[in-house]
Amino acid sequence: MNFLEIKGLRVFYPESSYSLNVDSLEVKEGETILIAGKSGSGKSTLLNSINGVIPHEIEVEEEGEVKVFGINVRNSTIQQIARFVGTLLQDPDSQIFNYYVIEELAFGAENLNIPREEILYRINKVSQIVGISHLLNKETFRLSGGEKQRVVLGSILIMNPKALILDEPTSSIDLKGTKEILTTLRGLKEKMSMIIAEHKINKVLEFVDRIIILDKGKIIYDIKRDHVKEVDFEDLGLEPLRPSPLPKKRRDGEVILEAKVKVTDGNRTIVDTEIVLRKGISALIGDNGSGKSTLLKALAGILPINLKFYGSIKVEGKEISKLPVEKRGEIIAYLPQEIDLMFTKKTVKEEVSYPAKVRKKYDERVIKELLKRFNLPEDRDPFLLSVGQKRRVAISSLLATGVKVFLLDEPTTGQDWYNRKMLGEELRSIDATFLVVTHDPLFVYYYADRVYKMVNGRVIPISPEDVIKDW
C-alpha cells in the first residue's frame, strides 16, 4: 500500500498570488522522503495538505485529491488522520501542554481512551526508543530544545502512527539537539514512513530514500538519494552539501562595546563573563541553556525581574548600564527569539517603519530599500507570515532605526540558505556592530568576523573555521 497518493492538488491562499500545484505524487509505505525548497516554496503547505490542517483548519481554496493510507484527507477529520500520521513542528514549545514529561507523553494516548496499563507500557517502550527514559519525571520547561523535540516525538509515537511528518524539526534547537533528534529519526527509519521538510540537507541525506525539491509551489526535482549529485543545491537557493572556500576576508574593526556581565537569580550565577565587540559581525554559539540569550538581555537592559545584573557596559567608552531601557534602546537594538511579541501593526511596511518613526529616524527610501532587499510583501499582515519572513520583518525594523549596536537572537531560524546569505550580505554592508546568537555553523563560517562560544555562562573566543569542522 502507498502511504501517500496526491492527484491534481491545487491550493490557493486568499489575497495572495501564491499557490501549491502538485499534479501527482506517490510515497510508498516505509519510504523516507526529504522535502526541500526555499522559504515560501510550498513545503509547509504540502505537509499541511497531508496531515489535514488544510483544508480543515486553514481556510484556502483547494482542489484535487490527497489520500493517506487510502483515506481521503478532505473527507476525514484531523483526529482521524492523526491516528495514522503524526506531525512534529519547528517549535517544540507549541506542542507541549503539560508540566511533567511523563504527563506529556501520556496526554495524546489518554485522549484516545487507551487503557492506563497500555499507556504505561508504551511510555516505557517509546522513552527508550527516543532516549528520554531519564527525563520522565522532569519538568518540561526545564528541558533543552533537543530534549523537548524528543519528548514531543515520543508523545506522537505513543499513539502508534504509521507515518511521521516533520516540518523543519531542527530549526529551533542547538547543534547538540540537532544530532540527538536526527539520530532518533535515523533509528525510526525502518519502523515507519517519514516525510521531512528540512533546510539542513546534508544532515538528513544519509537516511532518506528520495529528495523532492519544490520551487514556487511546484515539484522541480523528485530523485533518489543516489542521484543527489545531479542537483546544484546552492544554485537553487538551498544549503550546499559542502561549504566552498571562504569567499570573504574576516575584518578586524575598532572596539565599540566592552562589557563585564554577571547575572544571578539569587541562588546561582547564570552568566559571569567579559566580552568585547568590534565593529562588524561577532557570532555567539553554544548549547541551549549556556547563557547566550541571558547575556543579550543583560546588554540590552531587559532582564526578567527575577534576575539581577552586576557589572559594566561601555559603548564607545561611555557607561550605559545605568541608563533606563528607553535610553539604552537608542544605542543598542535587540531582536528577541519570540518575534511575535514585537509586532503591533497590521502591515509589514507599517511594522518595519514604526521603530524608525518613534526615534524620528524615518526615511521612506530606507524603508523601501529594506523591503526590497529582504523580499518582504509590504501589505501583508506580519502575523500571517512564515517564521523566516517574520524574522526578516523584525530585523528590517531594527535596521531602519540607524542604531549602531545590534543584538540578534537566532535571526536565521526558519530561513532558507538564500535568505540567510541575503541577511549575511546585508549585515556586512552596514557600518555597525552586530552580536549574532546562532546555531547556524554555515552562516557563522561565511559571515562572522569573530566567533565566541558560550560555555557555562562564560564567553570563549574560538576560530570561525572550528565551527564548520563537524558540519
Curated annotation (Swiss-Prot):
Residues annotated as binding ATP 1: G37, K38, S39, G40, S41, G42, K43, S44
**Topologically, how does it sit relative to the membrane?**
Peripheral membrane protein
Give one Pfam family, short name only.
ABC_tran
Cellular component GO terms, alphabetical? ATP-binding cassette (ABC) transporter complex
Which keywords does UniProt give here? ATP-binding, Cell membrane, Membrane, Nucleotide-binding, Repeat, Translocase, Transport
Which compartment or compartments is the protein found in? Answer: Cell membrane
Does the UniProt entry include the keyword Repeat?
A: yes
Annotated EC: 7.-.-.-
Q: How would you classify this enzyme at the top EC level?
A: translocase
Quote the record's binding site residues for ATP 2: G286, D287, N288, G289, S290, G291, K292, S293
Q: Which domain of life is it from?
A: Archaea
The protein's GO terms of the molecular function aspect are: ATP binding; ATP hydrolysis activity; ATPase-coupled transmembrane transporter activity
CDD domains in the record, alphabetically? ABC_cobalt_CbiO_domain1
Segments forming domain ABC transporter? 4-241, 255-470
| PANTHER family reported for this sequence | ABC TRANSPORTER ATP-BINDING COMPONENT, HEAVY METAL TRANSPORTER
Task: Give the UniProt family note.
Answer: Belongs to the ABC transporter superfamily.
- Role noted for this protein: Probably part of an ABC transporter complex. Responsible for energy coupling to the transport system.
* Listed name of the protein: Putative ABC transporter ATP-binding protein STK_11360
The species this protein belongs to is Sulfurisphaera tokodaii (strain DSM 16993 / JCM 10545 / NBRC 100140 / 7)
The upper taxonomy is: Archaea, Thermoproteota, Thermoprotei, Sulfolobales, Sulfolobaceae
